[in-house]
Amino acid sequence: MDNQVFSGIFARAREQHPLVHHITNYVTVNDCANITIGAGGAPVMADAREEAGEMTGFAGALVLNIGTLNSGIIESMILAGKVANERKIPIILDPVGAGATRLRTDSTRRLLDELTISIIKGNAGEIGVLAGAEAKVRGVDSAGISGDPVTITRTFARETGITVVMSGATDIISDGNKVLLVDNGHPLMGRISGTGCMASAVTGVIAAVEKDRLIAAATALAAFGLAGERAAAASRGPGSFKPALFDAMAELGPQDLAADARVRSA
């Protein structure tokens, strides 16, 4: 892939400062807001049923994250998602813990059934379960998947018409036809809570300015992974890594993606 493509998209996000509406979890809500700002966007978190749809109408993207779900939150997600679909606003779904409990799995399937999702991003266990593969989820973390991850990701994308991201040491992205692999990132990103949620937030920023969902997801994950690499170089461990990650994301420029994004075709 030509890194100038990712660089140009990231520059647009920095210039346009898109509003991204998050209905997310209370574990990482502040992290998602701050990483959205760092990536060039403007965050808003409105999960009340009385305003979720109205707020979505102002946004460039909608991010739905089921990390701490309940029945009221799911209804707000449906209301917001329907407005997004009516106005052709992209929806990014992060099915945190899908496969771990019946509530999480059923709620994710309901969102997939009732809404047109643009991008779904999950770990190997979450995507594997939703794709019908043999996979395990322990809490909100992947506990393994049986089968070829690239094939599972591509097939799930083809069957649903959704751009699918299976996150991992190498992120796998497919629109059902093409498959892109993103190698940016650092092991410290897996040693703090919330980096998966933050990756979805950054994806919302980029999807708000780029209609090609495959390229948008690759741009977002390369940028976030690159920020993780730079934060790790300035850190002593998980405690110092987290604030360094926000600094690195805020300091990242289009020229950094042009030089250091590592995205390849499968």
Curated annotation (Swiss-Prot):
Keywords: ATP-binding, Kinase, Magnesium, Metal-binding, Nucleotide-binding, Thiamine biosynthesis, Transferase. Substrate binds at M45, G194. GO terms for biological process: thiamine biosynthetic process; thiamine diphosphate biosynthetic process. InterPro entries: Hyethyz_kinase, Ribokinase-like. Its cofactor is Mg(2+). SUPFAM superfamilies: Ribokinase-like. The keyword Transferase applies. ATP binds at K121, S167. Catalyzes the phosphorylation of the hydroxyl group of 4-methyl-5-beta-hydroxyethylthiazole (THZ). Belongs to the Thz kinase family. NCBIfam families: PRK09355.1, thiM. This is Hydroxyethylthiazole kinase.
